[in-house]
């Protein structure tokens, strides 16, 4: 029998108390809940789906336009992903890439001489290790373009700027002084550490430096969110290791995470589906959160945890065994409750699928999901989260 990494402590906690699809997945999720009928409902859903499609097209257009703009300067126009945050200077001639999975900072600049390059690279490194999330958002032209699209669609905006540090709590043991930053930058960026390569622009080269983040950076970043995770684990009757495992798997604790869907932030919420569902559940208002709202860690953890609560206590509530229900909840967070049902029935009705699920042991449910989930990503996702739950249980305990 498989050794359960879902330990008894947080199974007991659960017993007592997406986001991978885009437009098609959004429609499936709408069909996964309680059945609703009537012409007005159908018309309303059609209007919602049309609005989501337009939003996605507008976001994709903004992304494509920005990519074309930076490609004028760079052979490879790198863009932000779930695990890597990429930002460009206003003139697009310097860029910074923080890889939260590889735990590196890579800065590149276009310059005529190594001397000029070293100076620019030092300034850029000092900036990225000291700036806040709000400052990073303000300096990112693509994020600002997306903010305009959100404003046009009446998305919920954050009430105040997010002044959480982006990297300083990972890089420095305490709030850094100017002297600490200057020493750090001087140690990391110098003529010996900077390398050059060919540029697509005449008379300049690409100068770059790669800086490794400190050891245990992942653990340090997770600790930054400890109080919010504890608060929401208690509020939504969830095991704390589950929330940490989802955050780690979704973004590697990158608060600026963005996927192509698009999904945003630490727990990778899609504004028009999981984001809207959870916001409506928490605040009783059917509105979608903006990208900026979801880049705020407090907001993201609240809504992401609420979305897990919805999956476990609403969509999966008829699954009797808490471990089986948890496996299905993890899969549903990534691929939607409808696709979990599809693994058993070939249709998207999760309530009907529970009859078959309840006939299986937790091990059998896990094996069935791994074998029959519609998408490979969801299968790998379940494995990763399951493994990381054990990791965070050992690190922090249940609550």
Residue ranges and their predicted role:
Residues 19-245, 313, 319, 346-399:
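Cell-wall glycan-active module
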Residues 1-7:
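Bacterial N-terminal signal peptides that target proteins for export
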Residues 8-15:
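Bacterial N-terminal signal peptides
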Residues 260-287, 299-310, 358-360, 385:
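Substrate-binding/active-site groove segments that recognize
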Residues 256-259, 279, 342-346:
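Short, solvent-exposed loop/turn and secondary-structure capping segments
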Residues 300-349:
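Catalytic and binding regions of secreted/periplasmic enzymes and modules that target cell-wall glycans
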Residues 217-220, 291-301, 376-377:
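Active-site metal-coordination segments of metallo-dependent hydrolases
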């Amino acid at each position: 029998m498989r050794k359960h990494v879902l330990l008894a402590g947080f199974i007991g906690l659960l017993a007592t108390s997406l986001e991978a699809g885009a437009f098609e997945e959004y429609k499936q999720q709408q069909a996964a809940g309680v059945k609703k009928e009537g012409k007005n409902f159908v018309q309303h859903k059609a209007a919602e789906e049309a609005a989501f499609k337009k939003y996605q097209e507008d976001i994709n257009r903004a992304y494509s336009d920005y990519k074309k703009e930076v490609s004028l300067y760079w052979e490879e126009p790198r863009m932000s992903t779930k695990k890597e945050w990429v930002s460009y200077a206003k003139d697009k001639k310097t860029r910074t890439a923080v890889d939260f999975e590889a735990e590196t900072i890579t800065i590149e600049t276009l310059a005529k001489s190594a001397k000029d390059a070293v100076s620019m690279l030092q300034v850029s490194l000092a900036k990225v290790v000291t700036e806040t999330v709000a400052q990073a958002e303000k300096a990112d032209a693509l994020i600002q373009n997306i903010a305009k699209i959100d404003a046009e669609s009446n998305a919920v905006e954050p009430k105040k700027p997010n002044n959480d540090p982006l990297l300083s709590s990972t890089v420095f043991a305490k709030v850094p002084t100017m002297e600490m930053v200057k020493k750090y930058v001087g140690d990391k960026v110098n003529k010996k550490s900077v390398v050059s390569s060919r540029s697509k622009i005449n008379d300049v080269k690409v100068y770059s430096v790669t800086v490794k983040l400190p050891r245990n950076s992942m653990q340090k970043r997770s600790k930054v969110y400890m109080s919010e995770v504890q608060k929401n684990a208690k509020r939504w009757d969830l095991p704390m290791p589950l929330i940490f495992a989802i955050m780690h798997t979704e973004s590697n604790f990158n608060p600026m995470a963005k996927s192509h869907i698009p999904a945003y932030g630490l727990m990778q919420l899609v504004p028009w589906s999981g984001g809207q569902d959870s916001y409506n559940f928490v605040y009783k208002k059917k509105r979608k959160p903006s990208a900026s709202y979801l880049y705020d860690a407090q907001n993201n953890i609240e809504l992401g945890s609420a979305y897990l609560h919805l999956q476990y206590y609403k969509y999966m509530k008829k699954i009797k065994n808490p471990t089986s229900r948890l496996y299905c909840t993890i899969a549903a967070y990534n691929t939607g409750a409808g696709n979990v049902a599809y693994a058993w029935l070939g249709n998207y009705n999760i309530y009907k699928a529970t009859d078959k699920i309840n006939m299986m042991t937790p091990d059998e449910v896990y094996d069935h999901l791994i074998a029959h989930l519609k998408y490979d990503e969801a299968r790998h996702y379940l494995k990763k989260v399951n493994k990381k739950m054990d990791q965070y249980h050992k690190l922090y305990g249940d609550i």
